[in-house]
């Protein structure tokens, strides 16, 4: 056994790190943990990754470096033993509307190559395989017949451009040919009277009989080559006396159509050679949107589901369609969503009887809008057309993005577009069962290996419910990160350090085991895997744990624990006691040894009012009815892809907003919203998007604390003397702000050929305000000093009554402290008041919003929806978050939380578990009830894992 190697970091000082020394074992699986804001990311990304990136850039040529700029050294004394560093963060991979799961994982590139190499083209008319024929095919055809069977080798008449039929026949005579076949009759060329079309004439190349003699076979091959030459690539065998004929062509054609031979670009929707010419590879066009024409699919045709056919005048179209549809037994009373595809086609494109009618006498939705377009010169028709226009599936490629020729190429009976529309689970199973010839398997060996391995990686990280056609910009941050992880695994790099930011985000406990397996695979390739993580399973699975703390901001930044998993995984009470005495400041060790824990509530709140969603059918939801109780803490659970977001974000939230007459996106398909809907006066979706509408937004402005801070500074003697009103202390309006950077503290230089450059403003040195504004002090601090305080520091500072010397100071300070206290309550005491919203993590943004609502007074009954609020939270932070949740409920509000964290789930009053699996195996209501009832449900995967948390 060789000596263990380490990545050694000496004197790390980035952000709040307190000059710490850390040793990370090389080639191991290492977890870095700690409460939010303790300095984990500062160590992992701002120190470890930043130095790895800097060294990489420094290793490039001076020519390449001039485009990348000089990267500053991270704040530390030195780092030894650092391999090349790769960071995989929670960022959506691409905003490119063409980027998909398939392209970002490179699986689609391998599929394109596979279809180009072994794909077979089939004619859409006859379904026969299209192929180029050779003389070998001609020979093989003759071998089907018994020896001695006579046949004639023919070439279709090919007239060279500029020649007449007579001249061409004369040329054949000169070349030694004597006979032609005209309409089934053999005649001599010099006897031809010229009373036939050229396409009915064949040149007789040779007469022969079926034989296995070497000389006869050689003669047949020569004759076939001559026939292909004279017939411009075409040849015909006519067997006698049966008159059975077989056509051959060296051209890639069948059924009179010349097909395009498969190439990899033929399947590329990013290339003009493969993209659908109508939608240019996007899969959608601006057209008549089905969702706008039929917004409520639970209505029937008779009830008026077709919005544009309502009213006295337009209702004539509906009456006429119903009259004509009667012979076809069209179900006019059936809800639209229950109609078959055939019935929907009749409604949209016309009844079978309409095909015989004049186009202007047809009745369908398509014909209706054709009429509207013809009357666009009238204002009312232009308005109607714009009302129903939207992004809709391309009518030519039906959303496949590729030109129609690409779908003629198949492997195992499936086209590439059929494969990318399968879920990854089904696609992986399809490849396992795929039957290929020995030659095809040999040609596609490497490609098949890459495809199946990468599909397995996606399954291992819990993404089996996605399709390869899913747009990258529609993925969550956690899904994007796991896709990045599978791409890294696929590249098979070794000797690197991978740094991941909470890879378990969005994962059900069932999938965490698979993720650990993937991380282990990455490590066993010869890499060091460093994860910034709070998930207990991942911490216990790691080889080594580093805990930064003990608390957030200036109270953190120290190394409170570093050691192998064997230390904290021990169940020996003496060993646990010794560990706690040795590392008393580590909250992580206290939770892992169960000294501290999040208690299960003694009882659950009863409820008697609820909102009921009936017939939820969005995405994979199976027409389920769900009751969401009010005035209690409800958690929505289920594996990834089970339908949680579709139900809550896709249906409940927009439907409630519309009920409250607020602007909202169109909700997903559902039948009705019932129950105590009127008991809700507001609905708030607290997501992880940046706070505020402006990039200048920060925690102080978002929580309205900055108004009181500006008033306080304007109340100081110097400010009054200089005539500075509160407006002068705003960085959003002219007056006191630095006009060079418009109060941002930095300037952005647009670089035409590379990413924009952000530099500290030279005029104000990053302080945002003019010099005379910065001369105004309160308690020895100017406005810039206050903006650079953490929330904890600010609360302490503004609570100090010794500094409140002037009339109005006390009231302003009281307001500031009351506005900032909720931030402390949700565990964000470490963030700075003036911290730019773009630098806050998703979890931090969500908790700033939560703090805002906790701080609001006189709020009418509100339904709060949270999407994975524990993202980025340590056990210690989750405890605080749950207290904040209880505070909202005690004020009479209702809480609905989409969550995977079992510590949160066990504290719920009511659980709605969807599943049982993801994708097409999900979308059902598995169980709804208390945590104990969910644990008792044998089909609930959530219950299976929750069992260990409820004692």
Task: Tell where the protein language model's regions lie, with residue ranges.
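Conserved phosphate-binding elements of NTP-dependent enzyme cores
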Residues: 1-951
């Amino acid at each position: 056994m060789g000596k263990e190697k380490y990545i050694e970091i000496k004197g790390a000082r980035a952000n709040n790190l307190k000059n710490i020394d850390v040793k990370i074992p090389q080639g191991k699986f290492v977890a870095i943990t700690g409460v939010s804001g303790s300095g984990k990311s500062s160590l992992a990304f701002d120190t470890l990754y930043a130095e790895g990136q800097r060294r990489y850039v420094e290793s490039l040529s001076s020519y390449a470096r001039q485009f990348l700029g000089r990267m500053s050294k991270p704040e530390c004394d030195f780092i030894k033993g650092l391999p090349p560093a790769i960071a995989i963060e929670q960022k959506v991979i691409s905003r490119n509307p063409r980027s998909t799961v398939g392209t970002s994982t490179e699986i689609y590139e391998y599929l394109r190559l596979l279809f180009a190499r072994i794909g077979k083209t089939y004619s859409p008319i006859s379904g026969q395989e299209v192929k180029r024929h050779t003389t070998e095919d001609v020979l093989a055809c003759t071998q089907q017949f018994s020896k001695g069977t006579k046949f004639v080798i023919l070439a279709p008449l090919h007239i060279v451009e500029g020649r007449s039929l007579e001249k061409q026949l004369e040329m054949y005579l000169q070349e030694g040919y004597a006979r032609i076949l005209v309409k089934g009759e053999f005649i001599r060329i010099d006897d031809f009277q010229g009373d036939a079309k050229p396409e009915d004439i064949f040149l007789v190349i040779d007469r022969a009989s079926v034989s296995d003699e070497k000389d006869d076979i050689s003669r047949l091959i020569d004759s076939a080559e001559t026939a292909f030459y004279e017939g411009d690539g075409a040849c015909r065998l006519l067997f006698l006396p049966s008159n059975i004929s077989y056509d051959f062509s060296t051209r890639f054609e069948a059924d009179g159509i010349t097909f395009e031979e498969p190439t990899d670009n033929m399947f590329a929707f990013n290339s003009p050679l493969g993209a659908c010419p109508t939608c240019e590879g996007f899969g959608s066009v601006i057209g008549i949107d089905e969702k706008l024409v039929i917004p409520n699919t639970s209505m029937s045709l008779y009830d008026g589901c077709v919005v544009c056919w309502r009213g006295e005048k337009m209702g004539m179209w509906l009456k006429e369609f119903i009259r004509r549809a009667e012979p076809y037994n069209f179900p006019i009373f059936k809800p639209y969503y229950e109609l078959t595809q055939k019935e929907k086609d009749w409604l949209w494109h016309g009844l079978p009887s309409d095909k015989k009618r004049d186009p202007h006498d047809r009745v369908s939705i398509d014909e209706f809008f054709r009429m509207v377009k013809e009357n666009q010169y009238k204002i009312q028709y232009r308005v109607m057309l714009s009302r129903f226009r939207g992004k809709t599936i391309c009518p030519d490629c039906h959303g496949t993005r590729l030109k129609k020729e690409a779908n003629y190429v198949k492997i195992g009976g499936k086209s590439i577009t059929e494969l990318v529309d399968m879920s990854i689970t089904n696609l992986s199973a399809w490849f396992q069962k795929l039957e290929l010839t020995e030659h095809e398997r040999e040609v596609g060996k490497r490609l098949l290996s890459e495809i199946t391995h990468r599909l397995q990686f996606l399954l291992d990280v819990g993404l089996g419910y996605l399709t390869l056609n899913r747009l990258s910009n529609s993925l969550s941050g956690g899904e994007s990160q796991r896709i990045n992880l599978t791409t890294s695994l696929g590249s098979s790099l070794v000797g690197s350090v991978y740094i991941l930011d909470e890879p378990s985000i969005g994962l059900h406990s069932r999938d965490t085991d698979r993720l650990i397996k993937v991380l282990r695979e990455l490590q066993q390739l010869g890499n060091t895997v460093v994860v910034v993580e709070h998930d207990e399973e991942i911490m216990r699975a790691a080889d080594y744990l580093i805990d930064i703390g003990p608390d957030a901001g200036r109270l953190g930044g120290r190394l409170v624990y570093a050691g192998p998993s064997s230390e904290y995984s021990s169940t020996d009470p003496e060993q646990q006691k010794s560990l706690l005495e040795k590392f008393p400041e580590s909250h992580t060790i206290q939770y892992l040894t169960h000294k501290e824990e999040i208690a299960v509530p003694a009882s659950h709140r009863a409820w008697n009012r609820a909102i009921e969603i009936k017939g939820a059918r969005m995405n994979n939801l199976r027409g389920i009815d769900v009751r969401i109780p009010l005035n209690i803490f409800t958690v929505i659970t289920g594996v990834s892809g089970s339908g949680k977001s579709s139900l809550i974000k896709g249906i409940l939230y927009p439907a409630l907003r519309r009920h409250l007459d607020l602007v909202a996106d169109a909700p997903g398909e559902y039948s009705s919203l019932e129950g105590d809907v009127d008991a809700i006066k507001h609905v708030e979706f607290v997501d992880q998007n940046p706070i505020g509408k402006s990039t200048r937004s920060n925690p102080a402005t978002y929580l309205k604390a900055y108004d009181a801070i500006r008033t306080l500074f304007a109340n100081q003697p110097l400010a009054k003397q200089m005539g500075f009103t509160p407006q002068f202390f705003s960085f959003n309006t002219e007056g006191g702000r630095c006009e060079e950077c418009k109060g941002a503290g930095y300037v952005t230089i647009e670089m035409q050929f590379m990413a924009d450059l952000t530099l500290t403003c030279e005029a104000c040195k990053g302080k945002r305000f003019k010099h005379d504004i910065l001369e105004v002090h309160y308690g020895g601090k100017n406005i810039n000093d206050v903006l650079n305080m953490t929330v904890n520091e600010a609360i302490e500072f503004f609570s100090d009554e010794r500094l409140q010397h002037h009339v109005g100071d006390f009231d302003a300070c009281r307001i500031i402290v009351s506005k900032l206290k909720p931030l402390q309550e949700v565990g964000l005491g470490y963030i700075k008041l003036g911290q730019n919203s773009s630098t806050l993590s998703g979890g931090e943004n969500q908790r700033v919003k939560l703090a805002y609502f906790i701080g609001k007074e006189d709020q009418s009954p509100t339904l709060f929806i949270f999407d994975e609020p524990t993202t980025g939270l340590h056990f210690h932070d989750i405890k605080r978050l749950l207290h904040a949740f209880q505070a909202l409920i005690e004020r009479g509000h209702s809480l609905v939380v989409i969550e995977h964290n079992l510590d949160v789930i066990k504290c719920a009053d009511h659980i709605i578990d969807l599943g049982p699996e993801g994708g097409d195996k999900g979308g059902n209501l598995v169980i709804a009830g208390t945590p104990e009832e969910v644990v008792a449900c044998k089909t609930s995967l959530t219950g299976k894992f929750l069992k260990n948390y409820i004692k």
